[in-house]
C-alpha cells in the first residue's frame, strides 16, 4: 500500500495534466455539438464519398447527423489516442525510472520483496488510468446533459468509455511488462506502442488481407461504429487482448525478480 501511495503521489502532476487536457478537449467537443449539428448531415455525405479514408478511421458506418455518431469519432480521436499515449508513458516509466534516477538500490534495501515493489507500481499505474477515465467520463456526461442530449446517455455511450478504459489498461500493462527489461529511457518506447497500435488499426481497416491485425491492436475493440450499432463490445478481440496483457505482465514479473539491478 505504501508503494502504491508513493508512486501515485510521485506521478500526480503527470496525471493531473493529462486528465485536464483530455477532459478539456473532449468536453469542448461535446459543448460545440449544437453549433456543429446543422452541418453534420453534409459531413456524413462528404465522408461517404471519400472511400478508403473514411474506412480507415471507421467513419464510413457512422451517422454524423446523430450525436452518438459524432461523439464516437471525436472520442476515438481524443480519448482513444490521447489515453493510449498516457497509458504507454505511464506503464513504460513505472519500473525503469528507478534505475534511470538511480533510486532502485535504495528502494530494494527496504524490507519488501521485488514482487511487492512490482505489484505496488502496477497498482499505481492502474489507479492513475482509472482516475483519468472516471474524470473524463464525468466531464462528458455533464456536457451531454448541458447541451440537452440526455437521450444519448445510453449503453453505447458508456460502453465507449469502457472500451477505451480497457484499451488503456492493455497498453499500460504491455508497456509495464516491457519496462522490466529496460535500464533507462523508455518514453519513446511507450509512445511507439501507443502510436503503433493506432496505426495498425488504421491499416487493418484498409484491406481485408490486413484484418488479422485487429487481433493485435486494442483499438479494434474500440470501433465506435460497432459499439454504437450493436450496443456491445467485440468480445473476441478483448479476449485476445487480455491474453497479450497477461503474457506481458507475467514476463515482466518473472524478469524483474531476477534482474541484476546496479
Task: Name the predicted role of every residue range.
Residues 1-23:
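Aromatic- and glycine-rich beta-strand/loop motifs that create alpha-glucan
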Residues 11-14, 28-68, 189-262:
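Terminal transmembrane helical anchor/hairpin motif
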Residues 23, 27, 31, 72-75, ...:
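Secretory targeting signals
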Residues 71-96:
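Long, hydrophobic alpha-helical segments
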Residues 84-91, 103, 139, 173-174, ...:
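Hydrophobic/aromatic residues in alpha-helical transmembrane segments
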Residues 88-108, 122:
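Transmembrane helix boundary and interhelical loop/hinge segments in multi-pass membrane proteins
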Residues 165-199, 203:
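A structural motif at transmembrane helix-loop-helix junctions in multipass membrane proteins
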Amino acid at each position: 500500500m505504501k508503494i502504491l501511495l508513493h508512486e501515485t503521489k510521485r506521478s500526480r502532476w503527470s496525471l493531473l495534466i493529462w486528465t485536464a487536457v483530455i477532459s478539456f478537449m473532449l468536453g469542448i467537443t461535446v459543448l460545440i455539438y449544437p453549433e456543429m449539428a446543422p452541418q453534420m448531415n453534409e459531413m456524413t455525405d462528404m465522408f461517404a464519398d471519400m472511400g478508403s479514408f473514411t474506412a480507415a478511421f471507421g467513419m464510413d458506418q457512422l451517422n454524423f447527423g446523430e450525436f452518438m455518431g459524432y461523439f464516437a469519432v471525436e472520442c476515438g480521436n481524443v480519448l482513444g489516442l490521447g489515453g493510449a499515449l498516457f497509458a504507454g508513458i505511464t506503464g513504460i516509466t513505472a519500473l525503469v525510472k528507478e534505475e534511470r534516477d538511480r533510486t532502485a538500490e535504495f528502494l530494494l534495501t527496504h524490507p519488501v520483496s521485488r514482487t511487492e515493489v512490482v505489484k505496488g507500481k502496477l497498482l499505481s499505474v492502474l489507479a492513475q488510468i482509472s482516475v483519468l477515465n472516471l474524470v473524463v467520463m464525468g466531464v462528458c456526461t455533464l456536457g451531454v446533459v448541458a447541451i440537452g442530449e440526455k437521450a444519448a446517455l445510453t449503453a453505447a455511450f458508456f460502453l465507449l468509455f469502457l472500451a477505451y478504459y480497457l484499451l488503456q489498461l492493455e497498453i499500460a500493462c504491455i508497456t509495464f511488462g516491457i519496462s522490466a527489461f529496460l535500464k533507462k529511457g523508455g518514453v519513446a518506447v511507450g509512445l511507439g506502442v501507443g502510436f503503433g497500435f493506432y496505426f495498425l488499426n488504421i491499416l487493418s481497416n484498409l484491406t481485408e488481407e490486413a484484418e488479422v491485425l485487429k487481433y493485435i491492436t486494442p483499438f479494434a475493440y474500440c470501433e465506435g461504429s460497432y459499439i454504437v450499432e450493436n450496443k456491445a463490445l467485440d468480445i473476441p478481440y478483448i479476449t485476445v487482448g487480455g491474453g497479450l496483457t497477461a503474457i506481458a505482465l507475467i514476463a515482466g514479473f518473472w524478469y524483474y525478480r531476477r534482474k541484476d539491478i546496479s
